[in-house]
A protein has these predicted regions:
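Active-site glycine-rich loops that stabilize anionic/oxyanionic intermediates
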Residues: 73, 79-84
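N-terminal cap/lid segment of alpha/beta-hydrolase-fold proteins
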Residues: 34-69
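Hydrolase active-site cap/lid region
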Residues: 167-213
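The serine-hydrolase catalytic nucleophile loop
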Residues: 82-94
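Short beta-strand/loop motif that positions the catalytic acidic residue
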Residues: 232-233, 238-240, 244
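Alpha/beta-hydrolase active-site loop
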Residues: 124-146
Length: 295
């Protein structure tokens, strides 16, 4: 890793045991080819494009940051967290675009608790599994865009969107890598703890400020979010706040034991959110990994 990247990450409060900001990792797949190191620069310009597409009978909104360059570029498809929207982790998205990497950010059907959501659907109709289908459809649409390099499609997700990203990656092919921010692997366990009896689940209830419906519970009640992580064939980089009390760091540590090719970066003095400064710095590192290989 270049000195500039290391300095940025040190400023971000990321713990490191070996100078690569890795706190835990499985064995890595050996490199078979040696490519010239690409120096990441984030001074490029980009164009914002908007899209709509259908998924599960609903019209969904997506926004893309597209670098102003010739030819096809790597593409990152972003999945937001519970109640958020396409603007979630926006500085990560912008930083990637300025580094020459396109970002396609969808708003899930019923996924936003905004008073003016951009996608159709009610929050009470949304679940992790409906979002998995939305993401599958987004991958199909986005990977065929004229500026996207189909051999360099990456997935990125925050919180519930991180869980959705991992579950989706278990079922799709040709994904080059995953970047997950405090992924909600603990969600099914939390649901079972909150509702010991499935037949006593209410029709609607409030979860972290978002009104959700019974389908949200029933769709993941029997899920083991960790069970198939060992089937992921692409590298995974997880970022998780040390002081996260919504999705504890232990959830990602548990996931690391199942993942074959993964890296966990622990963020000091960080809870269940990233500051704009952290987002920009993490976007810089993700760009470095996309250009120079996930470590």
């Amino acid at each position: 890793m270049g000195i500039g990247v290391a300095m940025l990450l040190a400023a971000c409060g990321m713990t490191s045991t070996n100078g690569t900001n890795t706190t835990n990792a499985t064995a890595q797949a050996p490199q078979t080819t040696q490519q010239a190191h690409v120096e990441v620069k984030t001074d490029g310009t980009y164009t914002v494009k908007e899209y709509d597409f259908e998924s599960n009978g609903k019209n969904l909104y997506a926004r893309a940051f597209v670098p102003d360059v010739e030819g096809r570029v790597p593409l990152v498809i972003f999945s937001h967290g519970l109640g958020a929207n396409a603007w979630h982790e926006e500085e990560v998205q912008k930083t990637l675009a300025k580094a020459g990497i396109a970002v396609f950010s969808l708003e899930f059907a019923g996924g936003s608790s905004s008073s003016a959501p951009m996608s159709e659907g009610l929050t009470t109709e949304m679940s992790v599994l409906t979002e998995v289908q939305n993401l599958k459809d987004a991958i199909r649409i986005a990977s065929g865009l004229e500026y996207a390099d189909p051999q360099k499609i990456y997935l990125m997700g925050s919180s519930q969107g991180g869980l959705v990203t991992a579950l989706t990656a278990e079922e799709v092919i040709n994904i080059a890598g995953l970047f997950l921010f405090y992924p909600a692997f603990s969600l099914p366990d939390d649901i079972r703890s909150s509702f010991p009896k499935l037949d006593e689940v209410p029709e609607t209830f409030n979860l972290l400020g978002t009104k959700i419906g019974k389908i949200y519970i029933t769709d993941i009640y029997d899920m083991d979010a960790y069970a198939n992580l060992d089937k992921l064939g692409m590298p995974v980089h997880i970022y998780h706040g040390k002081d996260d009390y919504i999705v504890p760091l232990t959830a990602s540590q548990k996931a690391m034991k199942r993942l074959k090719d993964a890296r966990l970066t622990t963020l000091e003095d960080t809870g269940h959110a990233l500051t704009p400064e952290q987002q920009a710095q993490i976007g810089f590192e993700i760009a470095d990994e996309i250009y120079n290989g996930m470590k």
